[in-house]
């Protein structure tokens, strides 16, 4: 009796414990009674063994068939409970150790605690669903998944494990990808915003730079004094005296001794003659900018220029004139410049200085001297220009002991000068009249490329209007007839002066001989010879004897024809500078240049050419008066062109202020 109950007691224990452990056959026997019997206990007892059996038994086919009936029977109360367990079980297998924790739970309380344990996992499952975006879990095992998973595990241990192990990584991968896409999209958005902001910032910086440049271009116009006042070659009277009028230091030393050995190195700046107007070398920065109108000059302090010129040392003196001095200087960058100091009390106002600096800053051409900068320090006003190292045409053509310029070099100089003047007359808007064209204002580099200098006093002429100057601008011998008679200047006045310079290149003679060796001016002497040469084609008598007939006949014809047309008395009959350029280049016939007049009917000799503006006899008389006036002027004789000058030829003198010292009053015709 006692044994029977003992045997009966283990029987149910084994019934509870063995069916889950055995797995396949007992589960098949127990599965049919479960539907008729109470669904809650059977459903509860079934899932725990399924979980434990998921790892041990491989067989699955019979269980898979039984799984569908279990799902409907347990669907109302159980689907929610086992479904969370099954997701817990697949999710823990991925981390590795959650599965061993689940098996002990069913043996502890198969009936009572089974409903309690499913409830806690449900929030965990919900958390897992929320964490893994839940959609994938529902897709893999929604309503059928919990029972099928349990049945599949019981019947097939190997097959369900891969999907379980795969499903969490898939879910995690999907969640990672979905969660990773958002940061990537955000990063791309941030990068795009940063790039756009950078571009906007760069655009703003560019706009600011452009605005600053425009402001700087306008600022140089605020400069004060007159720009080009000294004519170191003695042409100072012209007010814009040549910039470079005695370049080599040997030549400069001689000039210094001649002009006045008492000049101290600082006197040019401090004394009344202190401003040696300088066409100084342009610094590298302004020179390219000078190529365009509205160029920005560099500003210098007086101390900087004093250091550059070694205290305006006499050894650095390039030239002198009635309006000041030109000194050679070296900037800290190593660039050589010519510093022109303007003489105080020269009659130039700040507004005039501002206007002239603005004019020069707008002009840039390969055959024009460029402005580098300027300095205004108290009463001192200095201009800085590019330094042209090989002196002037006057120096090479008329200087004592200088080698003879060969013919190709003379043609090259004539053509370069013509191009520079044509640019001033026709390519600048408004056009610029030089008003002081002469050999002393033609600078040369070592390859004898031409740079036209000293056009700082040039006035802007508007359209076809001419202006009357109160000063005599230009050097004696270069003055146009209409200026001597009426004081009017135009671009055709520059053409006349250029014609005189062409005659210098052809003949090797100065425009006006103050030594008395040549009675007439160069123009009066050359006119009949030009007419004769045009008629018989023989230019030997007109050509410079130092050339020894080594010249091109065709080029001589072109140059002589241009000179003859340029020195016509009637300004209206003179060609434009652009026409002269074309003629010198050989692109225009001489008939076109002479406007159809035959050599025997040249306008400068024919009766009709004795225009109402001026006639040849009056011009000759006035030139003689100019010559007499120059000889009477002591200041002029003490200049570099005086009898003791290095040149010794007194080739150029000029200007108004010398003539306005009472001599003009004695000669009212002037």
Curated annotation (Swiss-Prot):
GO CC terms in record: plasma membrane
Subcellular location, record wording: Cell membrane
Reactions it catalyzes: L-seryl-[protein] + ATP = O-phospho-L-seryl-[protein] + ADP + H(+); L-threonyl-[protein] + ATP = O-phospho-L-threonyl-[protein] + ADP + H(+)
Domain of life: Eukaryota
Residue sites binding ATP per the record: 318-326, 340
Region (Disordered): 1-181, 589-613, 635-670
Catalytic class of the enzyme: transferase
Matching InterPro entries: Kinase-like_dom_sf (IPR011009), PERK1-13-like (IPR047117), Prot_kinase_dom (IPR000719), Protein_kinase_ATP_BS (IPR017441), Ser-Thr/Tyr_kinase_cat_dom (IPR001245), Ser/Thr_kinase_AS (IPR008271)
Any GO BP: protein autophosphorylation
Principal location listed in the UniProt entry: membrane
EC numbers, comma separated: 2.7.11.1
Biased composition (Pro residues): 32-62, 84-109
Residues at the catalytic site: 436
Tissue: Mostly expressed in flower buds.
UniProt xrefs under PANTHER family: PROLINE-RICH RECEPTOR-LIKE PROTEIN KINASE PERK4 (PTHR47982), PROLINE-RICH RECEPTOR-LIKE PROTEIN KINASE PERK5 (PTHR47982:SF71)
Protein's recorded name: Proline-rich receptor-like protein kinase PERK5
Source organism (scientific name): Arabidopsis thaliana (Mouse-ear cress)
